[in-house]
């Protein structure tokens, strides 16, 4: 598929998405596959989570528009997905959902170096973040925290 047709396809899919309060945040066309694979990543314009139903409801009109456009004259597989969960914890909902999960906490040190602590998310308050590091609870003031991310627990 040439760049011009890819741009036309992207514009077509964005129109379908906009009509459903969605936006395209990723389009990957794998022409080296047989059949061609069209991967579309969507998100809601209002920031709400994407459900499986949202993906399914976008699939049919997207497929219909691709067929009507005649931009592809070969068989293809259409895959619709969401961005998934971000590794970085930012909202109150994230902290409640992932309590007990392994996290990396990036700290800003006084000497301008970054220190990373690894433990289980224990508690978040207005003033501090608490993580469980090998059975000991460490309270970290939020003014020292740069970033909190989900991870795999290290020994």
From Swiss-Prot:
tRNA processing as UniProt keyword: no
Cellular component terms per the entry's GO annotation: cytosol
InterPro entries xrefs: Ribosome_maturation_RimP, RimP_C_sf, RimP_N, RimP_N_sf
Keywords per UniProt: Cytoplasm, Ribosome biogenesis
Annotated GO biological process: ribosomal small subunit assembly; translation
Pfam families: RimP_N
Chief localization: cytoplasm
Keyword Cytoplasm attached: yes
Localization (cell): Cytoplasm
Family recorded in the similarity comment: Belongs to the RimP family.
Known function: Required for maturation of 30S ribosomal subunits.
Stated name of the protein: Ribosome maturation factor RimP
Native species: Prochlorococcus marinus (strain AS9601)
Gene name as annotated: rimP
